[in-house]
């Protein structure tokens, strides 16, 4: 995802920096960064997707991909860069969205940066039925053009002003926000770069 690389370059995230991806899916960004020598831990809810990431890396980096439930699991440590591409919009309930932001705040180093990308054009709002969230479904992997089992998603799209409010209510400071159009598989997305308040 270009925004991940742009943020790494702009904020001078180095190969020695500790990087955390929230919601790695099929591993596109984490695998790319690992291949470039970055120190990445990629967390993903779907065990099938985690196993696919390990397979795609020929199990060279098995400890860099971990099945993880952001709503329940705990993780030690702080990270210099945390990024999440197209994940926050899957959390529909306000308390889940708050847990997501609190998780970032808890694990971001005092000088660290976080990149949060959400579906949406910055203006429209939408909320789906949460009863079908996280059921496993089959889809074609964009990396290998084969069928894989992944977690289906729910969707909550918010306007930029409403996202700014919820991010800042978690003691995070938004230092950049914009609409981007270069996230693979999405039309327009809201992009936020944050740091601890």
Where are these regions (language model features)?
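A conserved beta-strand element that flanks and buttresses the S-adenosyl-L-methionine
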Residues: 83
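Structured loop/turn residues at beta-strand edges in well-structured enzyme cores
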Residues: 77
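Short catalytic micro-motifs in class I SAM-dependent methyltransferases
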Residues: 86-90
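A short glycine-rich, Lys/Arg-flanked "PGG" loop and its adjoining helix->strand segment in the class I
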Residues: 98-110
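Class I (Rossmann-like) S-adenosyl-L-methionine-dependent methyltransferase catalytic domain
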Residues: 1-15, 20-63, 67-74, 113-197
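Conserved acidic residues
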Residues: 80
């Amino acid at each position: 995802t270009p925004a991940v690389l742009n943020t790494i370059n702009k904020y001078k995230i180095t190969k020695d920096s500790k990087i955390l991806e929230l919601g790695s899916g099929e591993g596109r960004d984490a695998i790319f960064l690992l291949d470039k020598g970055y120190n990445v831990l990629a967390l993903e809810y779907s065990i099938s997707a985690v196993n696919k990431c390990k397979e795609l890396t020929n199990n060279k980096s098995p400890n860099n991909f971990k099945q993880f439930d952001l709503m329940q699991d705990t993780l030690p440590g702080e990270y210099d860069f945390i990024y999440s591409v197209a994940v926050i919009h899957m959390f529909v309930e306000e308390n889940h969205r708050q847990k997501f932001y609190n998780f970032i705040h808890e694990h971001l180093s005092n000088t660290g940066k976080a990149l949060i990308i959400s579906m949406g054009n910055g203006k429209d709002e939408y909320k789906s039925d949460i009863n079908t969230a996280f059921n496993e479904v089959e889809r074609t992997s964009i990396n290998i053009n084969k069928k894989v089992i992944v977690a289906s998603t729910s969707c909550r799209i918010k306007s930029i002003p409403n996202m700014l409010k919820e991010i800042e209510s978690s003691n995070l400071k938004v230092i950049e926000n914009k609409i981007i159009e270069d996230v693979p598989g999405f039309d327009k997305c809201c992009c936020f770069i944050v740091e601890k308040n």
